[in-house]
């Protein structure tokens, strides 16, 4: 009987958790998008210049991203895939769409190594394809002076996009 009661409590707690998740998802789906963005010649040109075509799956996700970013509702999207499956190029396209519509974008990474890799990838695209980015990196190993300089570029709008580790999201040095 004790085990049955415990199982019932666990079930009810989990069920309550699922209800809250569903409610939050429904609320998020109704959150107004105050910054709708639309595909521009910049993203089309960038795609045409790439030495490879997007895969069928990437084209599908890129279409969904464009639709979501132009939607009257805020986007909440996670791009999931294996290493090397092309997630970064999709994120870069979304960041380019932000920049082309006059907004700043940011690419958060769970580790400093990945944040640096994203920064280097984006910087490489700037050099190779002449895209309108002024990337900046923000990580924990940067000196206080480097962080202040990065924050100043972000605040002034000079930096776009920002590649950072998740720990930097709430830090104000």
Which residues does each predicted region cover?
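Conserved SF1/SF2 helicase motif Ia
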Residues: 97-114, 118, 130-131
């Amino acid at each position: 009987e004790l085990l049955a009661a415990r199982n019932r409590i666990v079930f009810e707690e989990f069920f309550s958790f699922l209800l809250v998740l569903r409610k939050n998802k429904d609320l998020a789906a109704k959150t107004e998008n105050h910054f709708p963005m639309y595909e521009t010649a910049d993203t089309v040109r960038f795609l045409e210049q790439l030495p490879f075509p997007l895969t069928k799956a990437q084209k599908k996700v890129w279409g969904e991203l464009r639709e979501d970013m132009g939607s009257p509702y805020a986007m909440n999207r996670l791009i999931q895939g294996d290493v090397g499956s092309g997630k970064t190029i999709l994120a870069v396209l979304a960041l380019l769409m932000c920049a082309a519509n006059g907004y700043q974008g940011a690419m958060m990474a769970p580790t400093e190594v990945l944040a640096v890799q994203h920064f280097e990838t984006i910087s490489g695209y700037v050099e190779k394809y002449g895209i309108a980015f002024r990337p900046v990196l923000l990580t924990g190993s940067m000196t206080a002076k480097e962080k202040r300089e990065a924050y100043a570029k972000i605040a002034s709008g000079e930096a776009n996009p920002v590649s950072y580790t998740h720990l930097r999201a709430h830090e104000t040095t």
